[in-house]
Amino acid sequence: VLQQMGRAVEGKSTSDELAELHGLLSGKMAEAQQNPAERTLLQRFGECLDMLQTMPEAQVGLIRRVVAVIVEGQSWDLTYFDNRSQVESDEDTLRYTYQVAGCVGEFWTDLGYETMGARFCSPARRDLMRQAGVRFGRGLQLINILRDMREDAARGRSYLCSDEVCWQNRAERFLRDGLDYGSRLGSFRLRFTVMIPALLGLSTLQLIRGRKNQARVKVPRRKVYWLMLKAAFLSVMRRAS
């Protein structure tokens, strides 16, 4: 189904294939969803495809490219652990974190330049911003992996094959790259949008480093509000490009 949805977004599905997919998504799959928002999204997938057809060609190309990468990563995730319980190399981890998150930072950067031009960020920094966007996305996904690694291991899925501390340090570097990325964007709203997940990720990492048992860590709501204020403060001034 995942690959069928990817083909539909790419515009490669026949009318019969689309009809079959819509029936599956709006029927059994939607009924099986406990989250109402996810149920609605599946039921309205056809509307998403219709909206895609109304968008500028350049934006459609960006969307199709990032969806293809994400589908590839999620498909890998669904099949890789059928006959193994741990990734075989750090390269596997880096590839996976790019496919499910790093590519989104790259996409968001490209979309920003496509729709806003120099108002998004200095054109001279485009390549650097794309690279930083990839690292930022990877950092956020690494936080998910580090936070959930005990639960994942219990299900026979380990996304890391080397020292956890090294990956914690790498995640921190990537998230700080995200803060730098956000500080260079051209408007308060853009900077604020990036600062919040970066700060939440760093706070979650601090909890991961300090946990003494198997408990799943979560940033307290009061701390989230404080981080929002901090993000607003950091977003007031734009860093020189």
What are these regions (language model features)?
Residues 1-140, 146-241:
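Catalytic cores of Mg2+-dependent Asp-rich isoprenoid enzymes
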